[in-house]
């Protein structure tokens, strides 16, 4: 019974998921003072807006026949109406006393105000106070889009009324699929609150929920109250139900508390506080589950984000998160959200300043690493602190000048009591100057810079003597000049593509890079890794990414060619083909620890293609081919076909070779095929689904067996579009939470148009997982007070 009451309270308290929005103050620019004797432009008093008292607002009358004294009582007969700027009253016969504002409407009474229309056989009200009563009224509420019928309505003011024996629905269908019946309903439009007594929710004329007392919003605005409950089931947590309560604390901040029950683990309390003001915004979320039934200990997580402008170019922000243990997100993930893959939680605080030419900040950046026992990770280095400075001046006599400097203290957490590397300080500065030359059809960008780095390293010789690091110097420095020349051309011609007029482009590009060799073997590696070779990386100054603890020697030329076919009428890109390769004039001598230096004269060959030959079919191809061993290093092929609304099929294949044994800085190999579908099954039934299948085949070892061919994610669901009023959904999800384990979730949703949705919303999951997914319920345009005019 208590659960039933929770459900009914939430069903009628449709505050919805809202965003905290604040009023942003805008300061008007002050005009310069007029000189003495100069003419001054002033606003005429007659043009200023004056708010008249309600009793002073003029009324205009119209009818087939008008009789009586216009200064006291007037009778309007036949198509009668009394119109004021704030509303209109119509009827077959209207008696109107101008001195008191009383109106008596007989026959086809019709009143319109602020987009809300009320009709009935008769009505009595006062146009000055907007109070009165209506018999057997029908309502079309413009603020919420709902309709209502009642036996009697008492109107107390412009914003307050009471309805007796009410039937309400937010369904726009001629015969609503859902509606609410209540003995009485009090409406307060100023407070955005409706109070219903002895209310019952009917679905398909069957009562499904009841409550003696409930509140709900009467406008499409935020209101404190229960939100719709969410429920489902997962293999890790069991039956999962939550009932959020929303606090509309102020126009610019709010709070949502989420009591949650997980049958396998116990009761949890979560919360989210959001705020927004002039120059600042932020959010704080957290959950707490005492004495987990499965683990016997408290489980919790938190995250807070804040950004604030301090004035004069200064700002501050932070992003701080934490969890009680490594398995929190694998055990207690949100329904429909695959947070189980969360690995690093940030703990960052920053103060910065920016101006026209300079930017700087000081920050502390730490991490909490959530370890997977089946695939342990080395925790990243913390930056405690980091100082960053950038100066830039563009088009300075034709030159672009930049200067970037950083100073960082690196510290690394122990892993199982073991030290994984040295700690230390790093100072870097990198000034560059370029002279871009751009002309119609070609460009040329010469660039030169000098990168200087100084290290002061704590090698912890006692811990590292066994691998010979005790001979490394505490202080080292490195100076590397970097020179590049980037050039390209763009040719165009009229062409055709499969018989359709098109414009074809031919875009060759050359990029030469020269970086002399500097011995860097004695330098530590804090935050640097080998970058994936790609079209973007082929035109970068360094094959390493991150903090540039290594700068590779280079004497190389990258050549690329792109051709496009653009629709001659719209400019839409129908087909694009690209290829690139790097030619080396010098062997690689700078490497990361355990990295094998490159000896090849040519790099892997990059190819890519994007085609939208029809409006319904889009394909993408990207591949990296090794010409020396005649093998593909990386590849991706995808296609999406969407012949009509609510119909899409997407397939993809991704492949990446495994890194060499002992190489930890390259990504793990991948061999995966994916299929995602949204398809109409029969009439109102629609199917949705996705499957990701790993084709990896590993040796029969304990660790490798967990990565053998398996389904890494599976989604299957059905959607039923009942009519314009409701949609039913059931979705099943299975996904990997670690190298060895999976989680299974099943959730249901009943969406009632104009009221809300019971159950967990799977739309965000489907949007992320199914390319081109569309909701079976198209979004309704937001109504205004001008929605209905008479």
From Swiss-Prot:
* Signal peptide as annotated in the record: 1-20
Q: Where in the cell is it found?
A: Cell outer membrane
Q: Which GO terms describe its cellular component?
A: cell outer membrane; transporter complex
| Keywords, in A-Z order | Cell outer membrane, Membrane, Signal
Give the record's GO biological process terms. Answer: Gram-negative-bacterium-type cell outer membrane assembly; lipopolysaccharide transport
The record's annotation in Gene3D superfamilies points to: Lipopolysaccharide (LPS) transport protein A like domain (2.60.450.10)
What's the short name of a Pfam family annotated to this entry?
LptD
Principal location listed in the UniProt entry? membrane
UniProt-listed InterPro entries:
LipoPS_assembly_LptD (IPR020889), LptD (IPR050218), LptD_2 (IPR045659), LptD_C (IPR007543)
Give the record's subunit note. Component of the lipopolysaccharide transport and assembly complex. Interacts with LptE and LptA.
The family this protein is said to belong to = Belongs to the LptD family.
List, alphabetically, the HAMAP family matched: LPS_assembly_LptD
Job description of the protein: Together with LptE, is involved in the assembly of lipopolysaccharide (LPS) at the surface of the outer membrane.
UniProt-recorded name of the protein: LPS-assembly protein LptD
Species in which this protein is naturally found:
Bordetella pertussis (strain Tohama I / ATCC BAA-589 / NCTC 13251)
Q: Which gene encodes it?
A: lptD
